[in-house]
Amino acid sequence: MQQRYILALDQGTTSCRAILFDHQAQIVGVAQKELTQYYPQPGWVEHDAMEIWGAQMGVVREVLEVHGVKPAELHAIGITNQRETTVLWDRHTGRPVHNAIVWQDRRTAPLCESLKERGLEQQVRETTGLVIDAYFSATKIRWLLDNVPGVRERAEQGELLFGTMDTWLVWNLTRGACHVTDYSNASRTMLYDIHRLAWDEGLLEALDIPRSLLPEVRPSCGSFGTTHPEMLGGAQIPIAGIAGDQQAALFGQACFEPGMAKNTYGTGCFLLMHSGERPAVSESGLLTTIAWGIDGRVEYALEGAIFIAGAAIQWLRDELKLIDSAEDSEYFAGKVPDAGGVYVVPAFAGLGAPYWDMYARGAIFGLTRGTRKEHITRATLDALAYQTKDVIDAMGRDAGVPLKALRVDGGAAANNVLMQFQADLLGVRVERPPVIETTALGAAYLAGIAVGIWDQAAVAHQTAPERVFEPSMEDDERDRLYRGWQKAVRRSMDWERESDGGVQQSE
């Protein structure tokens, strides 16, 4: 029998990638192409949607050619994508009306403030699980309607379509036959009712967005059409799985039960915890989001972001010059048994969940004459683990379920000193997978399950960790260290706020 493959399309913020998986979920090949970033004004970030489409098809053809795989040997395609990034295009010509507005773009912050002033915060929170923020798609759509000449009129006449990047890719792969998205991506638009599983008419009216723009929403694992015969040499390949990047990573890490969580240690951290088949309401400023829809079920997650994670290690390297490479942090941190009472609070851009203090600033506490660079390096690594515990504890309270295990990915997950301290601090196992491509793997699993290659039980069985870090710290020691962290955070908070007739700030 000929080998059959699953193709994962990973449409990210900085690149388009195509990853070929075999039936054992092993990577056969990867192709990647960087994307141009456009910054037309400070705080604005755009992509050329046509460049994304061209780059995505280019890497698909490259990975197939390099590895001698015929399109007909593809069992299915799965798609994962940068979330929230917004494009509007003409349904007849397929041409975008403007560059795509990227998730990081802040141009709609004033519009968000006006929505808050209109008293919409509670409605948005209760309906979508999100907070009003420029991050999400809704205000990006409204900006395009209001600021690109002729777009509002064309939208109201039904000539235009909206999509996040998954929708844009499927529409092009099917030559306009399918205008669809999945539950996970829809839940990031700030327009989707995550309880009723429908676009919310009240929010569409409040934002003055025509309903005709929006795609059909389908379960994450299922049918999203087939590729048009002209796309891949006559082959019609089922597009069978879609999930936003962070939800795809949660699936790729097989976090299928409430209380299972994944943390991606990148420049910042993205933490998601599976919270069950009912949405958990957060009292800590975490986001409630749809994890995925599969087998007639919808499952939910809580999401929290840490602003500064790997960026703190880069700071040690680039600004303080304490280390020559990020990898050196493990070597120096491992030369001391602990941080020697030192705490680094990397609040360079304020603090996110659960503190939400934009006036907090970075600080180092507990310095003595005996403090060496090894202690400061160790304390900086420890800060990633402390911030993760802050968010995980908030998730446990909000979801009403304790953490079962933390599965990790991203660059800093390779740091053994950090991973052991993370396990010690949380008091649960930290599991690191052998495949670091967990986002693409999640998309491949969703597609493979839809076409009958795997089931969720098989996926759970396949995701044996490469290494498990077991907690070995005494409870008293864990509590003592964490109390010190909380004290350090309290003293970092509110640093930049005006007080006593002047501005409290560091030079």
From Swiss-Prot:
Signal peptide: none annotated. GO terms for biological process: glycerol catabolic process; glycerol metabolic process; glycerol-3-phosphate metabolic process. It catalyses: glycerol + ATP = sn-glycerol 3-phosphate + ADP + H(+). InterPro entries: ATPase_NBD, Carb_kinase_FGGY, Carb_kinase_FGGY_CS, FGGY_C, FGGY_N, Glycerol_kin. ADP binds at T13, R17, T267, G310, G411, N415. Pfam families: FGGY_C (PF02782), FGGY_N (PF00370). Glycerol binds at R83, E84, Y135, D245, Q246. Its EC number is 2.7.1.30. Inhibited by fructose 1,6-bisphosphate (FBP). This is Glycerol kinase. The lineage of its organism: Bacteria, Pseudomonadati, Pseudomonadota, Gammaproteobacteria, Chromatiales.
